[in-house]
Design a protein with these regions (language model features):
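Membrane-interface "cap" regions at the ends of multi-pass membrane proteins
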Residues: 2-40, 67-74, 78-91, 95-102, ...
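Inter-helical loop and helix-membrane interface segments of multi-pass membrane transporters/permeases
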Residues: 9, 13-18, 44-49, 79-103, ...
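Membrane-embedded translocation segments of transport machinery
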Residues: 12-19, 179, 183-332
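Transmembrane helix-boundary motif of multi-pass solute transporters/channels
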Residues: 21-61, 208, 242-248, 259-262, ...
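Alpha-helical transmembrane segments and their helix-start/interface "positive-inside/aromatic belt" motifs
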Residues: 24, 51-58, 95-113, 179-189, ...
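Short helix-coil transition sites and intra-membrane helix breaks within transmembrane domains
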Residues: 31-37, 77-79, 111-117, 233-240, ...
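Central hydrophobic cores of alpha-helical transmembrane segments in multi-pass inner-membrane proteins
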Residues: 37, 62-74, 78, 84-86, ...
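Hydrophobic core segments of alpha-helical transmembrane domains in multi-pass membrane transport
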Residues: 58-66, 105-130, 158-172, 187-200, ...
Length: 333
């Protein structure tokens, strides 16, 4: 069985290709996990659900369920060496399991339906930051988002741009496209995160934001917190969406699956924590109550940047630009 498995992997590597380096494999697969949920959902949940207490529950969910499920998808993807639907079919002679693969494909398709649109919004806000269109009072910023999201042309245009960028990367294959792009975008994402975290933590009253995120409050831990942490761990690691299984189809037989899953989980967690240290110190420095979702990203934070850096408007525009470039990279990877 081992001989058959090894020969099969070797054969599919020659036919299908594989990642050219370990760092490229890690960054590309981690990029598939890291996304907008790390920025607009995890930090808010952590702050509202007990701070460090929620984070500990989340880590437990990742270790006990997230990583084992990721390894399972790695095994299925690497052995199947095909798209997600066919990978499940190859592993089982029965017909029932093939529908699991199709469900993962359907899940990814449904997520793409809104994810591509929101990713396009991020690109629009990169443009708006460059042109200074987000500089104004809170009412203006809220109306700007409302007007843009209701526009029948611009959101579609930016969504098309997102698909064209993805298409350009994908047509160059694994090594020349996805791996090469991830080697550039993921380090840049971390650099931008660190720059904005430092800028946010130097603001007055930034410590209150750090406390909101990290101070443990075990009195808030209940069944809802466990359920929320479990759901966030699966969503953040892209479990059950076909993404992880597809990336694993390009893994070589030398790839240590446990080590890879652990490294990806650590990177994903680091991005989520840094996102919280970026958002909440800035929000609390101007007395803004943080929220989650699109309103946090496209209404609350532009106002926070405007007010926090009101003394130096150019700096506020620069931080806003860096933030939306960061978001665009997180969405694209």
């Amino acid at each position: 069985m081992q001989s058959y498995y090894g020969e099969r992997i070797k054969m599919t590597e020659l036919d299908r290709g594989s990642f050219g380096s370990k760092i490229g494999l890690i960054l590309a697969t981690a990029g598939g996990a890291v996304g907008l949920g790390n920025v607009w959902r995890f930090p808010y949940m952590a702050g509202q659900e007990g701070g460090a207490a929620f984070i500990l529950v989340y880590i437990g969910c990742v270790l006990l369920l997230g990583i084992p499920c990721m390894i399972s998808e790695f095994i299925i993807g690497r052995h199947g060496a095909s798209n997600t639907a066919r990978a499940y079919t190859k592993l089982s002679k029965g017909k029932a399991w093939k529908w699991v693969g199709y469900l993962e494909v359907l899940t990814g398709f449904l997520i793409t339906g809104y994810y591509a649109v929101v990713s396009g919004w991020c690109l629009q806000y990169v443009y708006a930051s460059i042109m200074g269109e987000l500089h104004g009072d809170p009412t203006f910023v809220a109306e700007y988002f409302k007007e843009f999201s209701a526009d029948p042309i611009r959101p579609v245009m930016w969504t098309v741009v997102i698909f064209l960028i993805c298409h350009f990367v994908i047509i160059h294959g694994v090594r020349g496209g996805i791996e090469k792009a991830s080697k550039i975008m993921m380090p840049v994402l971390f650099i931008l995160l660190l720059i904005i975290v430092v800028a946010a933590c130097l603001l007055p009253n930034a410590g209150k934001g750090v406390e909101f995120l990290l101070k443990p409050d075990f009195s808030k831990v209940d069944n809802g917190v466990f359920l929320g942490a479990l759901g966030q761990s699966f969503y953040s690691l892209s479990i059950g969406m076909g993404c992880i299984c597809t990336y694993a189809s390009y893994f070589s037989r030398q790839t240590n699956l446990f080590k890879t899953a652990l490294q990806i989980s650590v990177i994903d967690f680091m991005v989520a924590i840094l996102a919280g240290l970026m958002i909440f110190p800035a929000a609390f420095s101007v007395g803004v109550s943080p929220d989650s979702g699109p309103s946090l990203i496209f209404i609350t934070l532009p106002n926070v940047f405007n007010e926090a850096f009101a003394a130096v408007p150019v700096l506020g525009r620069a931080i806003s630009l860096l933030f939306y470039v960061l978001l665009s990279l997180a969405a694209l990877t």
